[in-house]
Amino acid sequence: YKRQGTVTAVATTAVERVGTQTGLPFGRYAYTTALQPQVAHVPAIVPLAWFAMGLPAREAAHSALGAHSTPARRIALGSAALTAWDLFLDPQMVGEGYWVWARRGIYRGIPLGNFVGWFVTSLGVMTALEALLPPNAYVDGSADADGALVGEYTFMGVMETIGFARFFRDPTVAIVGGLGMLPIAAVAVAGKFRG
């Protein structure tokens, strides 16, 4: 996954840099100095996170779609799956002081336009992954890796839901994020059992 990771990291670093300078596509925000190191004023961990959850989101989409999986459908559902993760990520990172919004939004201080920007950026990430992964990436010997990626997406959804409900004591984020990630995860896991 070196090539896919490199392309995703470079592209999302550029998107994040443009975002902090122009407000597009997420809205006006700025990274604090809490996350280091930074590249072009973007914490290095941020583009890595896009890739680290992009692959599981894509595989969850593929598994959920089953026999109806096509590149366009994987891109669309994978983008929704990745954006659903941000329903947990952004409230946590804003709460920890890793980035700040110029104007508080209605969802835990996050503007709703951020999630539109996430979906648009996720479309680019999913399109890149679709182009860079070979057409047979989902057959002949990849079942274990694919299952692990579905497991990772599901684990993140479950643990984030429990974490916000129990430890962060934020039932709103637990419910909203859970409703975003867990249905996709459940259908993806069922798809793995369908075979």
Q: Model features per residue range: what roles?
A:
Residues 38-56, 110-124:
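Membrane-interface loop-to-helix entry segments
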Residues 135-137, 189-195:
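Membrane-interface capping segments at transmembrane-helix boundaries
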Residues 13, 17-21, 79-96:
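Transmembrane alpha-helix/helix-exit interface in multi-pass inner-membrane proteins
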Residues 66-80, 136-152:
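Internal alpha-helical transmembrane segments of multi-pass membrane proteins
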Residues 11, 27-30, 47-71:
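Internal transmembrane alpha-helix with an interfacial aromatic "cap," most often the third helix
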Residues 1-4:
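Conserved small/polar residues in nucleotide/adenosyl-binding loops
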Residues 172-187:
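Small-residue-rich transmembrane alpha-helices that serve as helix-helix interface/gating elements
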Residues 93, 97-115:
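Membrane-interfacial catalytic/cofactor-binding modules of polytopic membrane enzymes
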